[in-house]
Curated annotation (Swiss-Prot):
Job description of the protein: One of the proteins required for the normal export of preproteins out of the cell cytoplasm. It is a molecular chaperone that binds to a subset of precursor proteins, maintaining them in a translocation-competent state. It also specifically binds to its receptor SecA.
Highest classification ranks of the organism: Bacteria, Pseudomonadati, Pseudomonadota, Gammaproteobacteria, Pasteurellales
Similarity field: Belongs to the SecB family.
InterPro entries xref list: SecB, SecB-like_sf
Superkingdom assignment: Bacteria
Protein name, per record: Protein-export protein SecB
GO aspect biological process, one term: protein tetramerization
Length: 170
């Protein structure tokens, strides 16, 4: 009987262990536009780069989550303001995630999973820009942990502001 209890205790501990597994990584959407070709190549290459990044996450099954990393890069010419190119990539993945508390789950979905997706998205952006025969564009690494901490601080400040406004009303 004691052996059976030990086995059940071991099974319980095993099921409570945090799990994060990649099931699939894929391109959900991609767009590359170079509206001013070929005359843009006749200008001096003095680009002004605009970079936007966001993430989305949704549950798609039991312990299955889709995380999408959205990257948008727009390059315009400093001198003329002409758009050289616009590159938009939605790199996504399905992850098995379990055994996490609420804050750990939020960190996993907004930091750890996007961190796994970023190299794929960065390579795709680089490849698309290269196929447009523009100079190489290598996106710098992103610190998703710092972005998550910044998000938490903004949320905390917003909650404090709301509490202060509610105190002023009463």
């Amino acid at each position: 009987m004691s052996e059976e209890n030990q086995v059940n205790a071991a099974d319980t501990q095993a099921t409570q262990q945090p799990v994060l597994q990649i099931q699939r990584i894929y391109v959900k959407d991609v767009s590359f536009e170079a509206p001013n070709l070929p005359h843009i190549f006749q200008q001096d290459w003095e680009p002004k780069l605009s970079f936007d990044l966001s993430t989305e996450a949704k549950q798609v099954g039991d312990d299955l989550y889709e995380v999408c990393l959205n990257i948008s890069v727009e390059t315009t010419m400093e001198s003329s303001g002409d758009v050289a190119f616009i590159c938009e990539v939605k790199q996504a993945g399905v992850f098995t995630i379990s055994g996490l508390e609420e804050m750990q789950m939020a960190h996993c979905l907004t930091s750890q999973c996007p961190n796994m997706l970023f190299p794929y998205a960065r390579e795709l952006v680089s490849s698309l820009v290269n196929r447009g025969t523009f100079p190489a564009l290598n996106l710098s690494p992103v610190n998703f942990d710092a972005l998550f901490m910044d998000y938490l601080q903004r949320q905390e400040q917003a909650e404090q502001t709301t509490e202060e406004e509610n105190k002023d009303v009463h």
